[in-house]
C-alpha cells in the first residue's frame, strides 16, 4: 500500500459522536448526519469518520467515533440541531493513503495501512485520532473510495 506523509490543516467539523461497535455506529451516525445535513441544507466540504480508539484494545461496546462533515471556520450551528457536536480535527503530520472499500469491509484497508506504516523507519504513529474522508457516494456506487489519515511523528 502506497502512502505519503502530509502536513494537514485543522478541520472544523460538525456531526454526531457515537459509542459502540463501529460496524453499527458508523452506519447509524451517517444516517443521522445525512438527515441533519439535508434538513439544515448544510453544504459540506467533506464527509468524515473520526476514530478515537484502537479496536484491538478497547471493547467494541466502548469504541468511539464521530460521523461528521467539515464546515467553514465561521460555521454556526443552526437551530434544531439536537445532538450535533461542533469540534475540530487537529492539524499536523499525517500518513495518508487511498483505498477502495468493497463489501462494507472498512477494517481491511485500515489494517493493511497500519501494518505498512508500522514498518516506516522515519515515522511512528502518534497518539491522536485517525480519520477517513469519503471520495464518492458508496451507497450509490456499491463501493467506497476513502482517504485514510493516521497521525504520525518523527522517530
Curated annotation (Swiss-Prot):
A molecular-function term among this protein's GO annotations: DNA topoisomerase type II (double strand cut, ATP-hydrolyzing) inhibitor activity
Keyword Cytoplasm among UniProt keywords: yes
Signal peptide feature range: none
Cell compartment(s), UniProt: Cytoplasm
Pfam families on file: GyrI-like
GO terms for cellular component: cytoplasm
Disulphide bond pairs: none
Xref: Gene3D superfamilies: Regulatory factor, effector binding domain
Quaternary structure (record): Interacts with DNA gyrase.
The family this protein is said to belong to: Belongs to the DNA gyrase inhibitor family.
Function: Inhibits the supercoiling activity of DNA gyrase. Acts by inhibiting DNA gyrase at an early step, prior to (or at the step of) binding of DNA by the gyrase. It protects cells against toxins that target DNA gyrase, by inhibiting activity of these toxins and reducing the formation of lethal double-strand breaks in the cell.
Record protein name field: DNA gyrase inhibitor
Species name: Salmonella typhimurium (strain LT2 / SGSC1412 / ATCC 700720)
Gene: sbmC
Amino acid at each position: 500500500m502506497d502512502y505519503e506523509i502530509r502536513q494537514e490543516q485543522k478541520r472544523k467539523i460538525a456531526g454526531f459522536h457515537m459509542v459502540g461497535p463501529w460496524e453499527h455506529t458508523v452506519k447509524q451516525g451517517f444516517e443521522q448526519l445525512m438527515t441533519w445535513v439535508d434538513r439544515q441544507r448544510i453544504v459540506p466540504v467533506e464527509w468524515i469518520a473520526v476514530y478515537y480508539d484502537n479496536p484491538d484494545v478497547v471493547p467494541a461496546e466502548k469504541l468511539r467515533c464521530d460521523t461528521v462533515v467539515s464546515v467553514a471556520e465561521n460555521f454556526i450551528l443552526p437551530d434544531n440541531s439536537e445532538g450535533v457536536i461542533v469540534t475540530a480535527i487537529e492539524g499536523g503530520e499525517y500518513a495518508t493513503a487511498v483505498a477502495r472499500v468493497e463489501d462494507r469491509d472498512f477494517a481491511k484497508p485500515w489494517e493493511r495501512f497500519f501494518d505498512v506504516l508500522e514498518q516506516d523507519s522515519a515515522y511512528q504513529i502518534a497518539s491522536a485520532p485517525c480519520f477517513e474522508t469519503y471520495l464518492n457516494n458508496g451507497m450509490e456506487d456499491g463501493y467506497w473510495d476513502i482517504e485514510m489519515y493516521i497521525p504520525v511523528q518523527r522517530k
